[in-house]
Structures are given as C-alpha cells and as structure tokens.
C-alpha cells in the first residue's frame, strides 16, 4: 500500500519549518526548540528572569523555554515544568508529565510548587489544532484561562506572567482581565514567531495579588 499523500497545508508547513532560520539555529546550537529564541527576545525586552527565581513553565515540552530560563536564574533558581508530552531531563528543571487540565495533575503540580509563591508563571500551551478557528480558538482560550488561574494560585505579589495567546474570539476580554490584575501589560510578537501565525505573547508584570 502506498504512502498517504500529505495535504498541501502540511507540506507547506514542513517546508517552512525546515527552511526557518530559527529552526536551523536551534538545531545548530543544540537547543530544544525554536521557542528558545522567542523567550530570549522577550527577556531582552522585558527583563523577567533574574538569578535565584522560581518559575513555573506550562506546556514545557520539548523544553526550549525551560532550557533558556535555567540559564538565566542560575543554580539557586527553580523551574517547575509541566506538559502532557514527554520531555527529556534538563538539569535544574523539575518536570511533571501530565494533562494540566486534570485536577490530579494540577494538584501534583501545586504540591511541587509548595507553600512559597513563585516569581514567574509562563505558558506556551496550545491545543492540537484542527484547522477550524471556530473550534481551535475556544480550545486555546480555555488553556490560557487555566494558566491565568494558576497565576492566581501561585504567583507572588509583583510577579510576572508570560502567555502565548491566539488572536480571535475572547482575546480582547482576556487581555482586559490581565490588565486588571497586573501593573504593566504588553503584547509581543517575537521575531521567531511565524508571521502567518495568530500567536502573540502577553507579557504582564507587577502582579497585584
């Protein structure tokens, strides 16, 4: 039986992926993913991470963000990461594999955080996309709402939140909610984010909790 022919959209994505300068740079530098460059650009602009911080990384696999943050917070810092997918170990990262939407996984994650509040919550979570915005955007918004709920539980006063959000229905309301909870809120589109993608990154600092 012959191989199943790829759709035009998946073939285009693969061509874009392997010709992408950030994919090539990540491979050359032995980085986990091109997402490393997105969080690096955000750090250069917004200065979120400092030595000794505790950071929660949601949607962490394959580990690009965690890998970057470990280099910024040093040996006395902590990264607590979670993803439904497997992730190869990273020194300095406490990784929990499981579905963040599951209450048992959430409780296990909260137990790893412990009693102390964290300095930064970051989320690069995204659903499996169907290609139908009417389905995909609500799924994506559900995940970012969960990430914000996590902030409300674990983020220290004056802490920071960075979250990937897909522009569409619910985006403006979500942005308004974040602005009510943080002193300074910016919407970033890093150079390493594909131009055709609806994704942007909300960077919020000065949590009022």
Curated annotation (Swiss-Prot):
Domain TRAM: 191-209
Active-site positions on this chain: 164 (proton acceptor)
Main location: cytoplasm
Subcellular location, record wording: Cytoplasm
Residues annotated to bind S-adenosyl-L-methionine: 63, 65, 83, 99, 124
Molecular-function annotations in GO: rRNA (uridine-2'-O-)-methyltransferase activity
Reactions catalysed according to its record: uridine(2552) in 23S rRNA + S-adenosyl-L-methionine = 2'-O-methyluridine(2552) in 23S rRNA + S-adenosyl-L-homocysteine + H(+)
Keyword S-adenosyl-L-methionine: yes
Listed GO CC annotations: cytoplasm
Record key words, sorted: Cytoplasm, Methyltransferase, rRNA processing, S-adenosyl-L-methionine, Transferase
InterPro entries attached to this UniProt entry: RNA_methyltr_RlmE (IPR050082), RNA_MeTrfase_FtsJ_dom (IPR002877), rRNA-MeTfrase_E (IPR015507), rRNA_MeTrfase_gammaproteobac (IPR004512), SAM-dependent_MTases_sf (IPR029063)
Superkingdom, natural source: Bacteria
EC code: 2.1.1.166
NCBIfam families: PRK11188.1, rrmJ
Function noted in UniProt: Specifically methylates the uridine in position 2552 of 23S rRNA at the 2'-O position of the ribose in the fully assembled 50S ribosomal subunit.
Protein name: Ribosomal RNA large subunit methyltransferase E
Organism of derivation: Haemophilus influenzae (strain ATCC 51907 / DSM 11121 / KW20 / Rd)
Name of encoding gene: rlmE
């Amino acid at each position: 039986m012959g191989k199943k022919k790829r759709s035009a959209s998946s073939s285009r994505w693969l061509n874009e992926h392997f010709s992408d300068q950030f994919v090539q740079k990540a491979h050359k530098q032995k980085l986990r993913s091109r997402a490393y460059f997105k969080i690096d650009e955000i750090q250069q602009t917004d200065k979120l991470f400092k030595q000794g911080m505790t950071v929660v990384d949601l949607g962490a696999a394959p580990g690009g963000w965690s890998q970057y943050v470990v280099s910024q917070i040093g040996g006395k810092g902590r990264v607590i990461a979670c993803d439904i997918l497997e992730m190869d170990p990273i020194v300095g990262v406490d990784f929990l594999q499981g579905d963040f939407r599951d209450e048992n996984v959430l409780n296990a994650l909260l137990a790893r955080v412990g009693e102390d509040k964290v300095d930064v919550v970051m989320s690069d979570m995204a659903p499996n996309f169907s290609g139908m915005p009417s389905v995909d955007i609500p799924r994506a918004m559900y995940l970012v709402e969960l990430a914000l709920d996590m902030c409300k539980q674990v983020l220290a006063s004056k802490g920071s939140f960075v979250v990937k959000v897909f522009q569409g229905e619910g985006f403006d309301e979500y942005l308004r909610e974040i602005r009510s909870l943080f002193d300074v809120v910016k919407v970033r589109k890093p150079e390493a984010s594909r131009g055709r993608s609806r994704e942007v990154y909300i960077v919020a600092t000065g949590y009022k909790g």
